[in-house]
Amino acid sequence: MSLNELIVAALKLFFYNKEQKSDCIFFCQVQIVIQISSSMFSLVIRRIHIRKLWYITVFTINASMFSGFFNNPSLLTPNENLLFQVGLHYSFAV
């Protein structure tokens, strides 16, 4: 699984619209800015909600939690979303 596919999996996990039973990523305009440093891997996501409200979502992954994770993506299993549930800290602001 590529890094892009992994990002999409995370987006689907956190933008899931429970009321409509659909994935909000298909209804939102998403802009992704990726910043990588020696210890942190950050995703800054700006999206437009269906109702045209702006949301800013910040995901931060502690790279030390994924020792060898990005160097060997073949180690991923179908449960890669669980890794994001454990490793992501997220906040929403209107």
UniProtKB/Swiss-Prot annotation:
GO-annotated cellular components: oligosaccharyltransferase complex
Organism superkingdom: Eukaryota
Pathway where it operates: Protein modification; protein glycosylation
Membrane topology: Multi-pass membrane protein
Coarse class of the protein's main subcellular location: endoplasmic reticulum
Subcellular location as annotated: Endoplasmic reticulum membrane
TM ranges: 24-45, 53-70
Gene Ontology BP annotations: protein glycosylation
Keyword flag Nucleotidyltransferase: no
UniProt keyword terms in alphabetical order: Endoplasmic reticulum, Membrane, Transmembrane, Transmembrane helix
Family recorded in the similarity comment: Belongs to the OST5 family.
Subunit structure: Component of the oligosaccharyltransferase (OST) complex.
Function: Subunit of the oligosaccharyl transferase (OST) complex that catalyzes the initial transfer of a defined glycan (Glc(3)Man(9)GlcNAc(2) in eukaryotes) from the lipid carrier dolichol-pyrophosphate to an asparagine residue within an Asn-X-Ser/Thr consensus motif in nascent polypeptide chains, the first step in protein N-glycosylation. N-glycosylation occurs cotranslationally and the complex associates with the Sec61 complex at the channel-forming translocon complex that mediates protein translocation across the endoplasmic reticulum (ER). All subunits are required for a maximal enzyme activity.
Name of the featured protein: Dolichyl-diphosphooligosaccharide--protein glycosyltransferase subunit ost5
Lineage: Eukaryota, Fungi, Dikarya, Ascomycota, Taphrinomycotina
